[in-house]
Amino acid sequence: EQGYHDIHSELTASDTERLTDEEKAFILNNFFSSKFETMIYRSENYKNLYQKRFSKDVATLEDFSAQELSDLMALFNLVWIDPAHFARYPRLEELWEKQYNYTQEDRIEILSIQKSIIREIIPTYKKYIEEGRIELSTSPYYHAILPILIDVKASVKSVLTTEGLPANLGMLDDAKYQIKSALDRIEEIFGVRPKGMWPPELCLGPKTLGLLSKAGVKWTISDEGVLANSINFDFIRDFKGNLNDPYHLLKVYEYQTKENSIDIIFRDRSIPNLINFEYAGINPKMAAGDLYEKIKMIQNKLLVSPDKTHLLTIASDCENCWENYQNDGIEFLENIYSLIENDESLETVLI
């Protein structure tokens, strides 16, 4: 009746006095799915409920009152809202400060604010696209690994064993459909046809590049390991992970197909790993400073380059990392963006 389409929202909006045992079990098994150090720990009540749930091997349904289940669902939804939105929605701050004795009406209000935030996403992206501040790329519609669909026999060159692979998958038409459907859908939603496409698992091959180019894709991306194999070059790093020679990695490569051409950029592998797995655990200002120093070190090594400009690609295909940061990484992002923005020798660009 409230228009919810997922079990988490349906339960959040429900009357906790009328929950079935099955629903209570689902809540206890799923509404603690939050990072403890950066999300659960922020709330004294949420932390206490977590400890009650996991302090013994088996927590029975009878251990939790209807009010505790109500608080659990309210706090779960609140910690998954980016802290930046609390300043924009004062009511969120009021609901967060409450911490205890949440009502069904409170929980429904939290869901309503969530919907308001979600409704802003597409208009905000459209605005930034129109202003030239961002560029959208897409992936094949169902995240298909294109080289396997196009030619599984060619793909076996990159795997250790062919066991379990079909003899000849032969799904070229499906690969074309995956590409076109993704481009069409993004254009339908945002009013702009993407120029770039992110290949799932960063897998590329000559036939894949040909299909992308024929579909109107202007650029795509892969990993430094793919580039190393393609140009027979070893990207050697020092003990801190800095490239000894970054020149080849900071270029845009043009691949000529039979009919067209497509640009390929290759990401630095080390920097995304730092953002995804290391920087969350240190002071955000220090983390931003370390990243900035690495960028400047790369820049300094290119002072004798014959090229006037170079492109450092920082691209992550990891699961969302920001929940590992305090405040969803706001301080880290603000610091690194500020450092880059105030450096006249650096410029963020569209591809």
Residues covered by each model-derived region:
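Acidic, His- and aromatic-enriched active-site or binding-groove loops in soluble protein domains
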Residues: 2-37, 156-176, 213-256
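N-terminal catalytic cores of secreted or lumenal carbohydrate-active enzymes
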Residues: 1-159
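Short, solvent-exposed turn/loop segments enriched in Gly/Ser/Thr/Pro and often Arg
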Residues: 1, 140-143, 196-205, 225
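Glycine- and acidic
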Residues: 103-108, 157-171, 191-195, 272-281, ...
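Conserved, mostly hydrophobic/aromatic
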Residues: 137-139, 197, 212, 265, ...
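Acidic (Asp/Glu)-rich catalytic clusters
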Residues: 123-138, 153-155, 212-214, 254-260, ...
